[in-house]
């Protein structure tokens, strides 16, 4: 009898525990469904679902993205790449009046990148604070991620929304699609905002080395430069790599200079390019830069890899020139182009485009500088502005096929120089 009572009590306790466990499971299931419903609701707010497509106020940014993607983009001249121009437009570009004088939009910055380097946009925009046109190359699964992250940047980052135009380039056999099903890319972003989007980009920075995107995948750097250039209506454009930063107030200095004099039709304004150790804070002015230059923390761009490629800039002369950090840009001296100089410059939008047959590593920028020279341009070096590359360029950091690509593009460059003779038959200049 005593044993029977014990057994009954045990059954009651066990039953109670089972009921409690079952209730906990039901509660957790309910919470999970509720969380999923909340996430779906938040996601539908971002991208819109078929159910709520006609309800409430439309998101013009989302609708523009949908339209841009629905066009399927356009093929480049080679037919190997698909280009989505103005995938997302900035508020600045959207508010530009059709037919407005391009001089009212004086200077824009054009740049190019893959997803693994797009995180540099944050510091670039923080320094530049003016219109930027960004051409992004994506391959494979990155096409879907790039589309999603571009939209997130434009949605959650006010400065990006205000000033950055995005263009997307992928292989012709791939297509960008609206990120309806990509919830995993956006979990938590709405609550945490812009810092979370750039943190997500940071997690992709080591996905692959520059130019080592995948087997049989060529980074079309000159196509991207042209897409970024063509994506702005500015009268003048500065084309740089996304891991470079201009000196502070460059845009204001240039606009102030225009009040006194415009560059001649055959003139580009060269910005001396430097590179700095990763651990250093980025100098904003020439005095700050020169101080670091004198102690070896800053050196000419490509100093270790190809000192001849930037030597014509005449860094020793430039460093010792007295100049004002504020006020208009000042032209200090003019240089005739010599091989193999690869200057970075501010040029009119009429400057010849980059030759898009150059891809991967080698001769992609020098080919365009060579054409400027043959076309009769002069290179005027400014004394109070500069560009800075993040980190020293060293031999060991490059991908394994760099030398092979360089040899291939050297052969292409020889052919390109011959074609310039036919394009500019009356020019006495040669590269």
Curated annotation (Swiss-Prot):
GO terms for biological process: muscle cell development; protein glycosylation; protein O-linked mannosylation. Its main location: Golgi. Residues 1-11 are cytoplasmic. It is found in: Golgi apparatus membrane. This is Beta-1,4-glucuronyltransferase 1. Keywords: Glycoprotein, Glycosyltransferase, Golgi apparatus, Manganese, Membrane, Metal-binding, Signal-anchor, Transferase, Transmembrane, Transmembrane helix. Glycans are attached at residues 216, 314. Pathway: Protein modification; protein glycosylation. The keyword NADP does not apply. Residues 33-431 are lumenal. Its cofactor is Mn(2+). It catalyses: 3-O-[beta-D-Xyl-(1->4)-Rib-ol-P-Rib-ol-P-3-beta-D-GalNAc-(1->3)-beta-D-GlcNAc-(1->4)-(O-6-P-alpha-D-Man)]-Thr-[protein] + UDP-alpha-D-glucuronate = 3-O-[beta-D-GlcA-(1->3)-beta-D-Xyl-(1->4)-Rib-ol-P-Rib-ol-P-3-beta-D-GalNAc-(1->3)-beta-D-GlcNAc-(1->4)-(O-6-P-alpha-D-Man)]-Thr-[protein] + UDP + H(+).
């Amino acid at each position: 009898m005593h044993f029977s009572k014990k057994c009954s009590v045990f059954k009651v306790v066990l039953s109670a525990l089972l009921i409690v466990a079952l209730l906990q499971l039901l509660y957790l299931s309910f919470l999970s469904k509720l969380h999923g419903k909340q996430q779906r609701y938040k996601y539908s707010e971002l991208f819109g679902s078929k159910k709520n497509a006609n309800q409430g106020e439309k998101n013009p940014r989302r609708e523009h993205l949908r339209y841009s993607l629905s066009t399927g983009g356009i093929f480049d001249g080679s037919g190997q790449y698909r280009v989505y121009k103005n995938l997302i437009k900035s508020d600045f570009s959207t508010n530009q009046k059709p037919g407005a004088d391009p001089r009212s939009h004086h200077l824009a910055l054009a740049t190019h990148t893959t997803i693994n380097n797009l995180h540099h946009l944050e510091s670039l925009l923080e320094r530049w604070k003016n219109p930027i046109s960004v051409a992004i190359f994506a391959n494979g699964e990155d096409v879907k991620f790039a589309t999603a992250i571009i939209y997130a940047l434009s949605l959650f980052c006010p400065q990006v929304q205000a000033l950055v135009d995005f263009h997307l380039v992928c292989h012709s056999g791939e297509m960008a699609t609206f990120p309806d099903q990509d919830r995993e890319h956006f979990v938590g972003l709405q609550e945490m905002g812009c810092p979370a989007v750039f943190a997500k980009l940071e997690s992709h920075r080591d996905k692959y080395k520059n130019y080592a995107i995948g087997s049989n995948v060529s980074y079309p750097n000159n196509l991207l430069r042209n897409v970024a250039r063509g994506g702005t209506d500015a009268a003048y454009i500065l084309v740089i790599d996304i891991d470079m930063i201009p000196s502070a107030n460059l845009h204001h200095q240039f606009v102030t200079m225009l009040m006194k004099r415009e560059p001649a039709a055959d003139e580009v304004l060269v910005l001396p390019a430097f590179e700095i150790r990763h651990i250093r804070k980025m100098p904003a002015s020439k005095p700050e830069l020169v101080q670091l230059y004198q102690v070896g923390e800053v050196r000419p761009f490509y100093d270790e890899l190809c000192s001849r490629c930037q030597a014509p800039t005449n860094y020793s002369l430039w460093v010792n020139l007295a100049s004002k950090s504020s006020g208009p840009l000042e032209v200090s001296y003019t240089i005739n182009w010599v091989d193999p100089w690869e200057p970075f410059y501010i040029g009119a939008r009429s400057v010849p485009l980059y030759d898009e047959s150059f891809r991967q590593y080698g001769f992609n920028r020098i080919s365009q500088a060579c054409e400027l020279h043959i076309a009769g341009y002069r290179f005027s070096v400014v004394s109070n502005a500069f560009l800075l590359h993040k980190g020293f360029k060293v031999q060991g950091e490059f991908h394994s096929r760099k030398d092979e690509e360089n040899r291939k593009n050297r052969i292409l460059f020889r052919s390109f120089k011959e074609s310039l003779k036919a394009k500019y038959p009356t020019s006495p200049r040669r590269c």
